[in-house]
Every structure is written in structure tokens, then in C-alpha cells.
Amino acid sequence: MAPSAARCHGGCVSRSGQCVLVPRPEQRGGFIERGDVIDGRCLVAGHLAGDRAWYSRPDHVVVVVMENHSAADISGNGEAPYINALAARGALFTRSFAVAHPSEPNYLALFSGSTQGVTSDACPLTLTGTNLAAELAQAGGTSAGYSEGLPAVGDPVCSSGTYARKHAPWVNFPSLPATVHQPFTAFPSDFAALPTVSFVIPDLDHDMHDGSVATGDTWLAEQLRPYATWAEGHNSMLVLTFDEDDRSRDNQITTIIVGAHVRAGRYDEHLDHYRLLATLKALAGLGNSEPGALQPITDAWTR
């Protein structure tokens, strides 16, 4: 049956029984949903006209940030069997880099697209301007940062036991609601209830900052293996990255993405915290229209 006008979406119209592209198609970071166009071809009821292939935006993305180890420290390390298992079944970015030393400016870059001029682990900070949580909220999405050891929802304390605020960049933006800042105990057991984008921040004992690689790897396996397994069958993604390496000039780190619609393999394209943020925004459908904006990852997804 010829496609009707109602089934030709986005920048496409029905002409002579075919969906055809009109001059200025909408494109959203390579991720396809109803109303979009890819490779100059039109979507029909959410699929490419004449093509069974499709793309899907994930319902949730969970970003876990570990600490202070280079890619060389982790790759093939017998003390990190779980991380290396994730790398084997997911997308491993072999040229992934942090943007600064010490920790805090890296977290700010990943969350807000800027180090905000911060060159230390200062606390407290009061910052303004755009950030991922604010952009998500404006677009109708949701976000949360789940920090292990945080005493209470929204607590602005700089440190408490093995919790460190310097690893929770959202706290530094007072325009965000306190509910963005959650203890890890609030991480949903019903994974379908996860926010659009969330961050998991292990404490200093479990993020490899103070504890060993083996301790951090074991924590990841115990705490996040159920979610990572669930994600692969439920349109969800887990991103594992590090804030920085061991303070070398190269600052090369491990970044792995696993989950639904992730094309397993090794990717040697350049990736840093800024480009990872651009990818998180694209995954959430936010776009990245600023002049000179970095392009998100587009080749690590299946159709």
C-alpha cells in the first residue's frame, strides 16, 4: 500500500505514492525517531522508507565515573576482570582522554561542557550557566547524580567519610533542584524508573582513588552488573569512564559503552569528556547546535 501523508514524517511528504525529502530535513545527531531523516532518506512510521534498518534513542543512559587510572592500567589487567569483560562485549574507545588534572575540572567538563576555569579540587563552588541537567529538564527529560556515601538528598557538604563533593559537579549549580543530588542508595532497583541520564559516583574507597583496581572492579561487578545485563535487552546504555589518568601528560583513560544498540568493537577515534557530553546530549535528543560544537559518537550504534 502506498504511504499516506500521515505516515511520511519529518522533512518528508507523500508524492506519487512515495515518501520524498523536502529541502531542509530535520537531523538530530544521527539518532532516529519519528519525524527524522537519515542519509537523505525518509522515515515511514518510524522506519526508513525501503529499509528495514532503524535506530533507537535509549530510554536511559547511566554514566559511571571511576578515578585516577590510565587506560594502560586497566586494559588486560587481571585485577579488573569485570571492566575488561565489559570492554570485550561493548564499544571500547582506545583513544579516550581526560581534559585536565586534578579531578574536579574533568567532572565539570563532562557535566557542563566547560572546566568553568577550575584548576583545583576547590569546595564549595557556586557556578552558573548551562549544564546537562538543566538542558534535560528544559527538554522534558530527567537526570540524577547518585553518589555513594552522600549523607542525604541535596546535601551540600564538601566531604563526609568517603564521599567527596568534588566528584559531584551538579551540586555546584544552585539553580538545579536538590533532588538531582541523590545518594547511591536511591539508585532505582526498577531500572525502568531510571532518569533519562544519570551518573553513578562511587566513593573514594570504590572508585580506585584510594582503593585498589581490584576493589573498584569488584564494586562495579557487584553493584552494576544487574543493570548492565538488563540494559542490553531494554533500550538502555551504561557508559564507564574515568575522570583522569595517573596524572601523566597524555591523560589517556578507559571509556566503554555497553547496552542496547551498541556495536561491540574497538574504536580508535578521538574521544574526550567534551565529546562524551556531546554524545550524551545526542542520546537524549538534545542536539548540539552551538557554533563549533563537537560531533557526538555516531559509528558505535547498531541499526
What are these regions (language model features)?
Residues 1-48:
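Extracellular/cell-surface secretome signature
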Residues 51-303:
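Flexible, surface-exposed loop/gating regions in the mature catalytic domains
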